[in-house]
């Protein structure tokens, strides 16, 4: 006899299957590409898209929502826009752009999205962070009080930089801006070799809109100096699209913030923000935003201020970490009154102004002391530095003024002639070859000799001052390292006596050679 099921049983089985059926509906926020022009895609749809949200095109290329209209969204393409075609489907990710962070990135060269550009293989970072984050608040900060040594005499003595400061490097092209930044990174090797893990200074170098050959030279120099092991290089070269150049400094800042927020110290170089502003101007004009002065959009100040405000010295409760920023801005014919230079000057805590005229006269680094200033760095200077550097800036300024006066050829009295002669020795002592940073203790010795032992120094011919300096520093390093070590704290009468005796004997020996 065949089993037969009545209608009620069949109905109950169907009802049970329907009630237990579980196939959740997945909703996706999608849109369709209407047009693509110069790295900007206009997309119809994406009703739930958020400003700054990351999206994916059908080809796998990423993009960021930077413009929201009634029915359309303007998306900057993070890659080759040839891979994006009209009619392609675009999907929202629900997230903003993130980059890998941590010690795993040290010694690596990455692009603005954190993807490796060297031959070091995949980066397996344990942490990722949003590239856009809020700057630390007032309560979370602490005043700058720890020095960041650059190894460059004229900067450490006259324009001191502290950890957590933002110091602008500004000047015309090809007069040593990048060299100052690189020497600062290289000098941290001496510091890092002598301190514990939490006191080390890690570095991030962000190359924006530069030639790939130039970036390769920078990376090779860092390798040769042993500085790449504590440095991450973020590259958005001239051949990269404008959105990648725009993102690069934010990505680099995020990498630096990892160290800052974990009680460590980081130095970040933005090379340079002029090209960053040009990239943002290009994007804004393509997004049809109204142009302002020099065709820059109205929010260009905010673009740089929200980046540079993330550099800070953190409070005790927040771990006492720091992020020090050295942005670089290129001027045209020394014009610091242009839009981007004035903006960045007003945001930062001081500026190091490089002058073409000084550079071509042979005074390198070509720092114009009259226009350069550090508004907070003096609080971070060592006591020994303050004692010898106080009168140096005034002496140099007086020499520059008297130098112009002496050109008229009039008779000069003895005091003016003495000031001129002292100024010539000071200028020679402040000159420094690139990629040869000097410890702060050695700088103190040289400036103490100028300020207090000029009678000894004047026995050396002007043409031999650089050789005298080189030999004297080596003499202190090899024969009297204990004296240099004492200078790392303060300078008392005993140390002054030791320096006087050492220098007097050395001058006699030097002149006899």
UniProtKB/Swiss-Prot annotation:
Per the record, GO CC terms? Answer: plasma membrane; proton-transporting ATP synthase complex
> Which membrane topology term applies here?
Peripheral membrane protein
Alphabetically sorted, this entry's keywords are: ATP synthesis, ATP-binding, Cell membrane, CF(1), Hydrogen ion transport, Ion transport, Membrane, Nucleotide-binding, Translocase, Transport
Q: Which reaction does it catalyse?
A: ATP + H2O + 4 H(+)(in) = ADP + phosphate + 5 H(+)(out)
Which GO molecular function annotation, any one, does this entry have? ADP binding
Q: Does the keyword Thylakoid apply?
A: no
Which top EC class applies here? translocase
**Role summary:** Produces ATP from ADP in the presence of a proton gradient across the membrane. The alpha chain is a regulatory subunit.
Member of which family?
Answer: Belongs to the ATPase alpha/beta chains family.
**UniProt name for this protein:** ATP synthase subunit alpha
Q: Which organism is it from?
A: Wolbachia pipientis wMel
Whichever gene encodes this chain, its name is atpA
């Amino acid at each position: 006899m065949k089993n037969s099921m009545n209608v009620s049983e069949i109905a109950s089985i169907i009802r049970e299957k329907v009630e237990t059926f579980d196939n959740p509906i997945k909703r996706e926020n999608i849109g369709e590409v209407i047009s693509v022009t110069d790295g900007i895609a206009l997309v119809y749809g994406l009703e739930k898209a958020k400003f700054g949200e990351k999206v994916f095109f059908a080809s796998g290329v990423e993009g960021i929502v930077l413009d929201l209209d009634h029915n359309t969204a303007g998306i900057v393409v993070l890659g080759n826009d040839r891979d994006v075609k009209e009619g392609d489907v675009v999907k929202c990710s629900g997230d903003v752009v993130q980059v890998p962070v941590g010690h795993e990135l040290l010694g690596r060269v990455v692009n603005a999205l954190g993807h490796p550009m060297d031959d070091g293989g995949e980066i397996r970072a344990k942490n990722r962070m949003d590239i856009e984050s809020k700057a630390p608040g007032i309560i979370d900060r602490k005043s700058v009080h720890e020095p960041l040594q650059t190894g460059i005499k004229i900067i450490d003595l006259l324009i001191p930089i502290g950890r957590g400061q933002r110091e602008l490097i500004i000047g015309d092209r090809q007069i040593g801006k990048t060299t100052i930044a690189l020497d600062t990174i290289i000098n941290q090797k001496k510091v890092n070799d002598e301190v514990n893990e939490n006191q080390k200074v890690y570095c991030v170098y962000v190359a924006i809109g530069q030639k790939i050959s130039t970036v390769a030279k920078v990376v090779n120099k860092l390798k040769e100096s042993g500085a790449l092991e504590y440095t991450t290089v973020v590259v958005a070269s001239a051949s990269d699209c404008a959105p990648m150049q725009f993102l690069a400094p934010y990505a680099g800042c995020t990498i630096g913030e990892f160290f800052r927020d974990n009680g460590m110290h980081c130095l970040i170089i933005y090379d340079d923000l002029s090209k960053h502003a040009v990239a943002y101007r290009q994007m804004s004009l393509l997004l049809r935003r109204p142009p302002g002065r020099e065709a820059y959009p109205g929010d260009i100040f905010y673009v740089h201020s929200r980046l540079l405000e993330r550099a800070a010295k953190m409070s005790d409760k927040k771990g006492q970490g720091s992020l020090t920023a050295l942005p670089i801005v290129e001027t045209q014919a020394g014009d610091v009154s242009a839009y981007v230079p004035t903006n960045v000057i007003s945001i930062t805590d001081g500026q190091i102004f490089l002058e073409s005229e000084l550079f071509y006269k042979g005074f390198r680094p070509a720092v114009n002391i009259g226009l350069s200033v550090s508004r907070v760095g003096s609080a971070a200077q060592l006591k020994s530095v303050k004692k010898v550097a106080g009168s140096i800036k005034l002496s140099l300024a007086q020499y520059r003024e008297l130098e112009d006066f002496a050109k008229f050829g009039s008779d000069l009295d003895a005091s003016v002639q003495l000031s001129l002669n002292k100024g010539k020795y000071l200028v020679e002592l402040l000159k420094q070859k690139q990629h040869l940073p000097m410890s702060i203790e050695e700088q103190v010795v040289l400036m103490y000799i100028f300020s207090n032992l000029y009678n000894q120094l004047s026995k050396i011919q002007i043409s031999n001052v650089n050789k005298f300096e080189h030999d004297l520093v080596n003499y202190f390093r090899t024969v009297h390292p204990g004296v240099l070590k004492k200078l790392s704290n303060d300078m008392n009468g005993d140390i002054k006596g030791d320096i006087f005796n050492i220098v007097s004997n050395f001058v006699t020996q030097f002149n006899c050679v």
